[in-house]
């Protein structure tokens, strides 16, 4: 696998099998709304202000710059739980030193509003959120397509979704992972944050490719015979039987890394039959590799073989990255939808755990690449 020479953008496989659904989606402030859900309640005391803001068509960094220019707080002294995209309307939380509170009394900006102010002991850090609630409005939806959307949503609600990294991770042209690979090869870059982002994009690209390979395996396990699975994956008859026996779409493998869902430690899948029950109950999920020296190692068998197919040519860079694990399979929570036939609008709302992308869910539903 020669990533440097690839000229096309890799397109991960979908878990659902329906044909593409016609709908118009624009990531504007009326049709795409994100609401952060904090990880904890704010105490009401301490040396930090927590600002609940609503930004429209601004990145988080652009919002911080506006607040910095108004309050005099250095950008590095602000805290946030997650970086949000420019497009759409976002309700999120930021922290800043309380001593600058007076500078906010007359704050006014057409794209940025301060809705509430709390106090707390700690500065907000990346990851200090439970997840995000999303509102998406699709337009120009015919009744026949609305029925297809409903069926796709019911299927995802029942089975879960592929927790790919979204197109936002990979830059304007979808290939900034190549720059990350160049840095790992020795290319110099002074901007430390950009350097880290590009290397992260490289890790994310490999994660997506491995997850896509697991989706392919799951489709094959559902559609092919034991004999065919043995021929394709060079596995034993017993392993093929185990795959065919699993009723859920995403197939677990003995020896792979699992994690307690949605927050929890990693462990190896040693007793497959026991872990399948916990997986179906959504207590655990499979964890894909973000390559690096400190990532939890896969055990053995087909899980390791499939992983090696993706990562074998990049092992020389392993020591240059910290590495970790990420859930490959996630679940929609608090899902609801409504269809307005007169306006031809189809509205969807759901909650995702932190780190998951609403655009990935939308691409799965529509079977369209939003990047294009």
UniProtKB/Swiss-Prot annotation:
Keywords: Isomerase, tRNA processing
Keyword Transcription listed: no
Active-site residues, Swiss-Prot/TrEMBL: 85 (nucleophile)
Domain TRUD: 160-330
GO cellular component: cytosol
InterPro entries: PsdUridine_synth_cat_dom_sf, PsdUridine_synth_TruD, PsdUridine_synth_TruD_CS, PsdUridine_synth_TruD_insert, TruD_catalytic, TruD_pseudoU_synthase
A Pfam family matched in the record: TruD
SUPFAM superfamilies: Pseudouridine synthase
Catalytic activity annotation: uridine(13) in tRNA = pseudouridine(13) in tRNA
Database matches in PANTHER family: TRNA PSEUDOURIDINE SYNTHASE D
Family to which the UniProt record says this protein belongs: Belongs to the pseudouridine synthase TruD family.
HAMAP family found in the cross-reference section: TruD
Protein name: tRNA pseudouridine synthase D
Organism in which the protein naturally occurs: Campylobacter jejuni subsp. jejuni serotype O:23/36 (strain 81-176)
Lineage summary: Bacteria, Pseudomonadati, Campylobacterota, Epsilonproteobacteria, Campylobacterales
């Amino acid at each position: 696998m020669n990533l440097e020479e690839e000229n096309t953008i890799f397109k991960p496989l979908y878990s659902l099998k329906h044909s593409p659904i016609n709908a118009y989606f624009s990531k504007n402030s009326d049709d795409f709304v994100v609401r952060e859900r904090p990880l904890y309640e704010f105490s009401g005391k301490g040396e930090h202000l927590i600002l609940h803001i609503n930004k429209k068509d601004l990145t988080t960094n652009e919002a911080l710059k506006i607040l910095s220019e108004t309050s005099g707080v250095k950008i590095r002294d602000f805290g946030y739980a997650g970086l949000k995209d420019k497009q759409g309307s976002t309700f999120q939380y930021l922290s800043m030193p309380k001593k600058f509170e007076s500078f906010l009394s007359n704050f006014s900006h057409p794209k940025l509003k301060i809705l509430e102010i709390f106090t707390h002991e700690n500065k907000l850090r990346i990851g200090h959120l439970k997840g995000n609630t999303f509102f998406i409005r699709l337009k120009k939806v015919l009744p026949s397509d609305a029925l297809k959307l409903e069926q796709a949503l019911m299927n995802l609600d029942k089975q879960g979704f592929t927790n790919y990294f979204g197109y936002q991770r990979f830059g304007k042209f979808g290939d900034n992972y190549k720059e990350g690979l160049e840095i790992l090869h020795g290319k110099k870059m002074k901007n430390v944050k950009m350097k880290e982002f590009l290397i992260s994009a490289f890790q994310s690209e490999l994660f997506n490719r491995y997850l896509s390979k697991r989706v392919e395996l799951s489709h094959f396990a559902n559609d092919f015979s034991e004999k065919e699975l043995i021929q394709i994956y060079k596995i034993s008859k017993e392993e093929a039987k185990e795959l065919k026996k699993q009723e859920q779409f995403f197939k677990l493998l003995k020896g792979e890394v699992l994690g307690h869902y949605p927050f929890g430690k990693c462990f190896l899948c040693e007793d497959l039959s026991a872990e399948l029950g916990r997986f179906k109950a959504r207590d655990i999920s499979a964890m894909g590799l973000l390559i690096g020296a400190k990532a939890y190692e896969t055990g053995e068998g087909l899980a390791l073989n499939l992983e090696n197919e993706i990562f074998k040519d990049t092992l020389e860079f392993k020591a240059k990255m910290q590495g970790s694990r990420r859930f490959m399979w996630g679940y929609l929570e608090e899902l609801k939808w409504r269809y307005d036939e007169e306006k031809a609008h189809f509205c969807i709302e759901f909650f995702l755990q932190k780190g998951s992308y609403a655009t990935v869910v939308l691409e799965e539903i529509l079977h369209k690449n939003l990047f294009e």
